[in-house]
Swiss-Prot record:
Chief subcellular location: mitochondrion
Any one biological process term the GO annotation gives: transmembrane transport
Mitochondrial intermembrane-side segments: 166-195, 317-735
MF annotations from Gene Ontology: ABC-type transporter activity; ATP binding; ATP hydrolysis activity; ATPase-coupled transmembrane transporter activity
Region (Disordered): 712-735
Tissue expression as described in the entry: Ubiquitous.
Protein name: Mitochondrial potassium channel ATP-binding subunit
Cellular-component GO terms for this entry: ATP-binding cassette (ABC) transporter complex; membrane; mitochondrial ATP-gated potassium channel complex; mitochondrial inner membrane; mitochondrial membrane; mitochondrion; nucleolus; nucleoplasm
Keyword line: ATP-binding, Ion transport, Membrane, Mitochondrion, Mitochondrion inner membrane, Nucleotide-binding, Potassium, Potassium transport, Transit peptide, Transmembrane, Transmembrane helix, Transport
Functional note: ATP-binding subunit of the mitochondrial ATP-gated potassium channel (mitoK(ATP)). Together with pore-forming subunit CCDC51/MITOK of the mitoK(ATP) channel, mediates ATP-dependent potassium currents across the mitochondrial inner membrane. An increase in ATP intracellular levels closes the channel, inhibiting K(+) transport, whereas a decrease in ATP levels enhances K(+) uptake in the mitochondrial matrix. Plays a role in mitochondrial iron transport.
Binding annotation for ATP: 507-514
Family the entry assigns: Belongs to the ABC transporter superfamily. ABCB family. Multidrug resistance exporter (TC 3.A.1.201) subfamily.
Length: 735
C-alpha cells in the first residue's frame, strides 16, 4: 500500500554521482481513473490540475513551489533507467510513509510522482488496470463470513490434529524400542492407550475435514453465483460503446471460465493453503521442542525457498494472464463462427473458420505450455529442495542419536513432522500456480464489475403519458463513434420530427441515417449539440423510461429469443396480459400465422427465430414494439430484406402501427416512403434537402437523382453512385 501512496519521485534509484535526488512533490489523484491511450492504465501528467475531491494543502503547494525554484538552478545529472516498481520505490515508501501520515493524513491523497497525473475528462468508460480488487472481493465474501469462519476453525482444527499425530507416533516408537518379545503383555498394555488415542485423532481429523470441505463448498458456490450475477448485471449496464469494442466470446469467458477459476482457487486457499500453513507453523513449533539444531536447518532452507518462489511468481502471473486472454480470444472466434453458421455455410468458409480457430488454439497451447513449464520448474526445484532437507535431517539426526543427544522416538517424531512440513509446503507449491491463475481470473472479473457506464440505465425525469406529445428535435448535433473518434458521422445535424407525423430519412449508405436512430434511442450521446423530446434534453430523461415506454424500435434484422412466441412479444412489456399480446399480434398482422401453428402462441421459435421466415420474424418484432404503445416509432429498413409478398403484409402492419405516432423511417427503397409527411435526404452527415415526395422531385436535387437511379437499377445492374450537389439546398418544411 505504501508503494502506491508514496511514490514521490524516488523510483528509479539515485542519480549517478548524486547521493539522493530531490523529492518531487506533485498532486495525487485520489481516484486512479485511467483511460486508454495506447495501453490501459497508463497515467499522464496534467500540470497544475488537482483532484476534484481532494486538494493539496497550502503548505504542500508552497513546498512544491520552493522545490521547483531550487530545482531550476541545480545542476542536473542524467536519469537512471526507471523500473516500476524498484527497490528505491519500496525504500522510499517505507521510510517516508509513517512520517507523512503523522504530519498530514491527506497527503496520501494529494501526492503523485512526476510521471503520473489525472487524465482529462472522457466520454468513454474508464477501464481500470487489471489488478485484483480486494474491496469488491470483500463485498462478495462479507455475507458468508460466519460460515467461512466455521470452516476456517474446522480446517485449523484438522491441521492441529495433524500436528499432534507425529508426536504420538514417536511415543509409540519409544514403546516398541523398550520392549522385546519377552515383554509382550507390558507392551500391549502400554501401547493400547497410544493406539486408541491415535485412532481417535484419525477419526476427529476425518470429521473435521468433512465439515470444512462441505462448508467451503457452500461458501464457494454461493460466491460464484453472486459474482456471476453481479458481472452479468454490470455487463448488461454497459454502454453500447463497450460492446462495440469487446467480443461476446471474451465476455462469456469471464462469466464462465474466469469465475470458475477464481472459485476453485478460493476454495483451495482455505482447504489446502490455510491448513498447510497451520501445519507448517505447528510442526515447526513441535520440531523446535524436539531438536533446536535440526529445526534451524529447516528454518534456514525455508526462507530461501520462499524467496525463489516470490521471484518466479511475477513472471508466472504475467504468463497466466496472457494465457487466459488468449483463451478468451479463441472463444470469441468460436462464438462468432457458430453464431453466424448460416453465413459461414453460405460462403463455404468452414475451412477458413477452422484455420482461424486452430491458430488461436495453437497460441493458447504455446502460452499454456510456457506457463506449465514455469510451474513445473518451480515444483521441480521445490521437490529437490525438500528431499535435500529430508536427507540433511537423517544425516544430522542420526549423528545426534549416535551421540545420545536425541532418542530414536524423538527422531521418528521429527522425521514424521518434517514430512508433514514437506508435504504441506509441496501442497503450497502446487497451490501457488492455482492461486496465480485465480488472482488473474479474479482481476479480470472485478475489472468489468468496476466499470461505470457513461449513460446510466435509469435516473432522470419522466414525462406523464397525457403530457407526452412526441416532438423530437436534433439541434446542431455532431457525433463520432468512440471507436472512431477522428471520423464525424453527423456534422451540425439539425432536424425536427413533428408529433404524429412520419419523417423518412433517405440517402446513400454511410450518410448517418442509422446513427440518428441510435441517438434517439440514446444508445450514444452526441459529441456536440442536443437531442430533445418535447423540448427536454434526452440526457435529463430517464433512459429506462425512454426506451421502455416512449420509443419503439424495429430493425432490418429483428432478433428473437429462443423461447415461445408469447414470451417474445411480451418482451416489449413484461407485465402485459395475454389479451394485450393477442391485440398487438393482430395489429402487426401476425395473429393468423401464429394460430396456424399446432402450439399457437406457445410455439418455440428456436435460437434467433431460425424456425420462422423473415416476414414472420419481422411481424413478431412489430408486435413486440407495439405492445408497449410507444409514442415514437423507429423503423430502420424494416422491409428491405423481405420478398414482395412479405413486404406487402409487413408494410400494412407498419402503416397501421404508424397512425397517430411520431415515426422515423429509415429506408433505401424510396417507394416505401412516398407517403411520408417529410422526406429528409442525408449526405455527408448533414440534411441535404427535405420536403414531400412531390416537392423534392420538383427541386430536381439529390432525391430526384436517387429516384432516377433506382428506376434504372431495377434490374439490379451495377451503376456508379449519383453525384452529390455542390452544396445543401435551402429548405423549409411545414409540418
Amino acid at each position: 500500500m505504501l508503494v502506491h501512496l508514496f511514490r514521490v519521485g524516488i523510483r528509479g534509484g539515485p542519480f549517478p554521482g548524486r547521493l539522493l535526488p530531490p523529492l518531487r512533490f506533485q498532486t495525487f489523484s485520489a481516484v486512479r481513473n485511467t483511460w486508454r491511450n495506447g495501453k490501459t492504465g497508463q497515467l499522464h501528467k496534467a500540470e497544475g490540475e488537482y483532484s476534484d475531491g481532494y486538494r493539496s494543502s497550502s503548505l504542500l503547494r508552497a513546498v512544491a513551489h520552493l522545490r521547483s525554484q531550487l530545482w531550476a538552478h541545480l545542476p542536473r545529472a542524467p536519469l537512471a533507467p526507471r523500473w516500476s516498481p524498484s527497490a528505491w520505490c519500496w525504500v522510499g515508501g517505507a521510510l517516508l510513509g509513517p512520517m507523512v501520515l503523522s504530519k498530514h493524513p491527506h497527503l496520501c491523497l494529494v501526492a503523485l510522482c512526476e510521471a503520473e497525473e489525472a487524465p482529462p475528462a472522457s466520454s468513454t468508460p474508464h477501464v481500470v488496470g487489471s489488478r485484483f480488487n480486494w474491496k469488491l472481493f470483500w463485498q462478495f465474501l462479507h455475507p458468508h463470513l460466519l460460515v467461512l469462519g466455521v470452516a476456517v476453525v474446522l480446517a485449523l482444527g484438522a491441521a492441529l490434529v495433524n500436528v499432534q499425530i507425529p508426536l504420538l507416533l514417536g511415543q509409540l516408537v519409544e514403546v516398541v524400542a523398550k520392549y522385546t518379545r519377552d515383554h509382550v503383555g507390558s507392551f500391549m498394555t502400554e501401547s493400547q492407550n497410544l493406539s486408541t488415542h491415535l485412532l481417535i485423532l484419525y477419526g476427529v481429523q476425518g470429521l473435521l475435514t468433512f465439515g470444512y470441505l462441505v462448508l467451503l463448498s457452500h461458501v464457494g458456490e454461493r460466491m460464484a453465483v453472486d459474482m456471476r450475477r453481479a458481472l452479468f448485471s454490470s455487463l448488461l449496464r454497459q454502454d453500447i460503446t463497450f460492446f462495440d469494442a469487446n467480443k461476446t466470446g471474451q465476455l462469456v469467458s469471464r462469466l464462465t471460465t474466469d469465475v470458475q477459476e477464481f472459485k476453485s482457487s478460493f476454495k483451495l486457499v482455505i482447504s489446502q493453503g490455510l491448513r498447510s500453513c497451520t501445519q507448517v507453523a505447528g510442526c515447526l513449533v513441535s520440531l523446535s521442542m524436539l531438536s533446536t539444531r535440526l529445526t534451524l536447518l529447516l528454518m534456514v532452507a525455508t526462507p530461501a525457498l520462499m524467496g525463489v518462489g516470490t521471484l518466479m511468481g511475477s513472471g508466472l502471473r504475467k504468463l497466466s494472464r496472457q494465457c487466459q486472454e488468449q483463451i478468451a480470444r479463441a472463444m470469441g472466434v468460436a462464438d462468432e463462427a457458430l453464431g453466424n453458421v448460416r453465413t459461414v455455410r453460405a460462403f463455404a468458409m468452414e475451412q477458413r473458420e477452422e484455420e482461424r480457430y486452430g491458430a488461436e488454439l495453437e497460441a493458447c497451447r504455446c502460452r499454456a505450455e510456457e506457463l506449465g513449464r514455469g510451474i513445473a520448474l518451480f515444483q521441480g526445484l521445490s521437490n529437490i529442495a525438500f528431499n535435500c532437507m529430508v536427507l540433511g535431517t537423517l544425516f544430522i539426526g542420526g549423528s545426534l542419536v549416535a551421540g545420545q543427544q536425541l532418542t530414536g522416538g524423538d527422531l521418528m517424531s521429527f522425521l514424521v513432522a518434517s514430512q508433514t512440513v514437506q508435504r504441506s509446503m509441496a501442497n503450497l507449491s502446487v497451490l501457488f500456480g492455482q492461486v496465480v491463475r485465480g488472482l488473474s481470473a479474479g482481476a479480470r472479473v472485478f475489472e468489468y464489475m468496476a466499470l461505470n457506464p457513461c449513460i446510466p440505465l435509469s435516473g432522470g425525469c419522466c414525462v406523464p403519458k397525457e403530457q407526452l406529445r412526441g416532438s423530437v428535435t436534433f439541434q446542431n448535433v455532431c457525433f463520432s463513434y468512440p471507436c472512431r473518434p477522428g471520423f464525424e458521422v453527423l456534422k451540425d445535424f439539425t432536424l425536427t420530427l413533428p408529433p404524429g407525423k412520419i419523417v423518412a430519412l433517405v440517402g446513400q449508405s454511410g450518410g448517418g441515417k442509422t446513427t440518428v436512430a441510435s441517438l434517439l434511442e440514446r444508445f450514444y450521446d452526441p459529441t456536440a449539440g442536443v437531442v430533445m423530446l418535447d423540448g427536454r434534453d434526452l440526457r435529463t430523461l430517464d433512459p429506462s423510461w425512454l426506451r421502455g415506454q416512449v420509443v419503439g424500435f424495429i430493425s432490418q434484422e429483428p432478433v428473437l429469443f429462443g423461447t415461445t412466441i408469447m414470451e417474445n412479444i411480451r418482451f416489449g412489456k413484461l407485465e402485459a396480459s395475454d389479451e394485450e399480446v393477442y391485440t398487438a399480434a393482430r395489429e402487426a398482422n401476425a395473429h393468423e400465422f401464429i394460430t396456424s401453428f399446432p402450439e399457437g402462441y406457445n410455439t418455440v421459435v428456436g435460437e434467433r427465430g431460425t424456425t420462422l421466415s423473415g416476414g414472420q420474424k419481422q411481424r413478431l418484432a412489430i408486435a413486440r414494439a407495439l405492445i408497449k404503445q410507444p409514442t415514437v416509432l423507429i423503423l430502420d429498413e424494416a422491409t428491405s430484406a423481405l420478398d414482395a409478398e412479405s413486404e406487402r403484409v409487413v408494410q400494412e402492419a407498419l402503416d397501421r402501427a404508424s397512425a397517430g405516432r411520431t415515426v422515423l423511417v429509415i429506408a433505401h427503397r424510396l417507394s416505401t416512403v412516398r407517403g411520408a409527411h417529410c422526406i429528409v435526404v442525408m449526405a455527408d452527415g448533414r440534411v441535404w434537402e427535405a420536403g414531400t415526395h412531390e416537392e423534392l422531385l420538383k427541386k430536381g436535387g439529390l432525391y430526384a437523382e436517387l429516384i432516377r437511379r433506382q428506376a434504372l437499377d431495377a434490374p439490379r445492374t451495377a451503376a456508379p453512385p449519383p453525384k452529390k450537389p455542390e452544396g445543401p439546398r435551402s429548405h423549409q418544411h411545414k409540418s
